[in-house]
Every structure is written in structure tokens, then in C-alpha cells.
Amino acid sequence: MIDLNGIRLRNRLVTSSSLLGYGAPKGRFAALGLSPISNFVDLRRFGAVTVRTVTTQPREGHFTLKESWRISEIPELLRLYRGALQEADAGWLNAFGWSNIGIDRYFDEYFPRTTGQNRILSLGGFSPDEFASLVERVNRQAPSGSLAAVEFNVSCHNVNFDFNPIIEEVLKRAVPASRFPVILKLSPDFDYLAHAKLAEANGVAALSAINTVKGLRLNPKSGAPLLKNRYGGLSGRAIKPIGLRVVSELREAGIKL
């Protein structure tokens, strides 16, 4: 067991938000339940599983909220995926746009099915009020010890929103209200040093460095963007040097988180 400033991890391997959806599949072809790997790998073995970002209300984003698909509908599902997820050199470019079922449905349908996992719940909002509401719902519905932490996602490129003006107020209001340790997710495309200092000053337990890097992929024939949202977030091996640079700069700046 690892204690990271109050965040208890079973080991050092922590999944990133979205990769494993809500921690359990639902239906044979589950677009948003995701987690097909959970049919083959025991997710309890991870240090922690970071749940796909949830918002106060269900949100379609740039994808779909439809979860169950018949075999005949798979071509349509693949078309939607191509508009939200594209392979890139040494990585993936995604623009799901916080497509999610909403926090209430997560707690009703998925939370009870993943009790053996060490969960980090990623929260996304567009105002301090929304983050305060999300924290209040987590406090009410998640028993003590049932989450390793909550993650504040204020760095998503795919929702076309400027988080910079709200970050300080989000931290001042929502961090003290949370019964669980808070992780702040940093973007290498924003002023991450300033955001890290705000996090340190407002009681955040840890930083997630980094979120995806804003990128673009074009159709080589037409020159049109391949993603529905035009731009997307680049993840994978391609961004590891950027992540290491951000971590190094945070350390050089004296950030203790």
C-alpha cells in the first residue's frame, strides 16, 4: 500500500480517466460502459482505477449516450468512434467531449458493481457551483473509504471552455467541502505552474500531470479534420516527454504535491 499525501494506492500503476470507462462493461457492445479489459483483467490489481469524468447531468458531448448496440448497428457505432477517436503517431487523438451518463446514474448503476476496485472518481464542471454540487453528491453517496480520491478535471480541451477564470474559485469552494482527497488534473497547454500553486495553497492532495495535449489530425486527401470537434487530446507514448518536462518544471518551481 502506498500513501500519497492521504491518497491510498495499492501500487504505483494507476489508470487514466476514460480508458476504462466506469470500471465495468454494460451490455455486449457498450460504448460508454467501456472496460472490455475488465472481462480479462481483474481491475482490483491496479493501484487505482480512475473513472471516466462525470458531470452533474448526462452529457452527449461529441459522441453518444447510447450504451447498448445490436450487431447490425455496429457500423454506426464505429462511425461515431472515428469522429471521436483517431490513431496518431505513437498515440491516440480523442475528442469525446466529456460524453458521460452523469453522476447520479454512475452511482446508481456502476458504483455498486465496482466495490472491489480502488477508485478515483473524475469530476468535470463548468462553474464553481457545479463542482460544489458534484462534491456534495459524492459526499452523500460514497461511503467513507470507498474512493481513494476525487479528481477535478479543469483541463479538458474537448469541451470548448476556458477553465482558467474559474479554477481558483473551484478550489476554494470545493476542496474544503470534499470528504475525500482531491487531485487536480493539469494541462500542459494551460498555465500549469500557476494552477499547481493554487492547488497547493488550497489543500489539494496531489496533481495529475498531465492531461492530454491539444492536437489535430487531417484527412490527407481532403485536408479536413478527422475528428468531429476538429481538435482533440493526444495521449500515449508520444506525450511522455512532455509529461516528464511538466513534472520536472513543477519540481523546479518548488511544488511539494
What are these regions (language model features)?
Residues 135-187:
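Metal-dependent enolase-superfamily TIM-barrel catalytic cores that perform enediolate-based chemistry
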Residues 103-116, 165-188, 227-257:
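Alpha-helix-loop-beta-strand connector modules within alpha/beta enzyme cores
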Residues 18-20, 54, 124-126, 155-157, ...:
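Active-site beta-loop-alpha junctions enriched in small/polar residues
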Residues 92, 154-166, 195-255:
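Glycine/Thr-rich beta-alpha phosphate-binding loop at enzyme active sites
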